[in-house]
Amino acid sequence: MPGPQGGTGAPSMSLGKLSPVGWVPSSHGKRRLTADMISPPLGDFRHTMHVGRGGDVFGDTSFLSNHGGRSGNTHRSPRSFLARKLQQVRRVGVPPRRMASPAATSPAPPPISPIIKNAISLPQLNQATYDSLVVSKLSFDSTPASSTDGRSGYGLESGFCTISRLPRVEKHSSRDRDHDRDPDHSQDREQSSSPSEPNPNPELRRSDSLLSFRFDLDLGPSLLSELLGVMSLSEAPAANPPAPAANPAPTAKPPADAVTTLDTVTSLPAPTASSPSSGRFPNGVTAVLGPVAEVKASPVGEGPQVPSKMAFDRRGASWGAIRASRHYTEMDARRELAGVLPQVHGSWESLNEEWSAPPASSRAPVPSTVQANAFEFADADEDDEVKV
């Protein structure tokens, strides 16, 4: 006799073939993880434990704390374990106090993320193996002292690898500076301290701290400094011009009213035969006879004085009195210099000999008056330009 389902022809479904996940109640219809979905620990970080947002905790969570998680039995009480963990997370900045239970083998961990410990202790995650790994790889100055105020401490006691904070690094640097300044005092202090006294502040050595690395990079002198050095060297000769070797300073300088340019003196032409009759005085000044202008001799060490009517004006291009009515040409300037300044013979050496002070015995007396050429000027209609 066919069953009630045989008449409809629908295939029969056995309840034994259904997955147990389908019978798990869910408020939102989502699949929740169960203990049988988690494989046993295989030594891999990804399959060791699981903590869900909804409070699902599976696997070995003994590395988090010895007070809550237990290997193999953690999934039995996920709610109580998660509640304790959430309470520790909410109290950020306040380290959890030690529990008075005698079964506690180690203090509660500090309020830091346990993932740091997981990343360091891969692939072993149990507490005993981690402690041995930390002892073998990291060397501490001394064993941590037991906390007397009921708070947990860092370092080897809590099973967490901590890095020196900034105040500790500053304390190290200050100690090093004090040691460099006064090595004898620090040595006496170390000898006076008892070797059996534990260090109240356990911390890693400077070589093990990540903050102790220093990178000194020397790039050498900059390009700007080299350019400034070259510019300073090029400006130094310009600032201090060398003294002219071929232009000695005369002992007797003519006054400012007279022309003292030696280059102009060297280009002076010798008096020609067509010029008026002239005579030569012992001091080398050539006097031309003709319309004369009186020049008074000055004391020793000064040049001949020119009358005020023949003095240069501000522009120095002509004589003040005569320039108003006549043009002043280059030939007039040469004739003027030929009458006032001594003639140059030979080279610069001969000029130096003439200007240098001769001995007192061989020095000729200077006449009281010297007649110079009364300068001849061109007509007023001459179109030559005045050369300054």
UniProtKB/Swiss-Prot annotation:
Bias (Pro residues): 239-253
A GO term for molecular function: small GTPase binding
Biased composition (Basic and acidic residues): 167-191
Membrane topology: Peripheral membrane protein
Modified positions (Phosphothreonine) in chain numbering: 34
InterPro entries recorded: Cdc42_effect-like, Cdc42_Effector_BORG/CEP, CRIB_dom
Pfam families xref list: BORG_CEP, PBD
Gene Ontology BP terms: positive regulation of actin filament polymerization; positive regulation of pseudopodium assembly; regulation of cell shape; Rho protein signal transduction
Annotated segments matching region Disordered: 1-28, 165-206, 237-257
Residues recorded with modification Omega-N-methylarginine: 53
Cell compartments where the protein resides: Endomembrane system; Cytoplasm, Cytoskeleton
GO cellular component terms listed in the entry, alphabetical order: cytoplasm; cytoskeleton; endomembrane system; plasma membrane
Keyword Ribonucleoprotein: no
Modified residue annotations for Phosphoserine: 19, 27, 39, 65, 77, 101, 113, 121, 139, 193, 207, 209, 212, 298, 318, 347, 350
PANTHER family attached to this UniProt entry: CDC42 EFFECTOR PROTEIN 1, CDC42 EFFECTOR PROTEIN BORG
UniProt similarity note: Belongs to the BORG/CEP family.
Function, in words: Probably involved in the organization of the actin cytoskeleton. Induced membrane extensions in fibroblasts.
Domain notes: The CRIB domain mediates interaction with CDC42.
Protein name as it appears in the record: Cdc42 effector protein 1
Protein's organism: Rattus norvegicus (Rat)
Organism ancestry: Eukaryota, Metazoa, Chordata, Craniata, Vertebrata
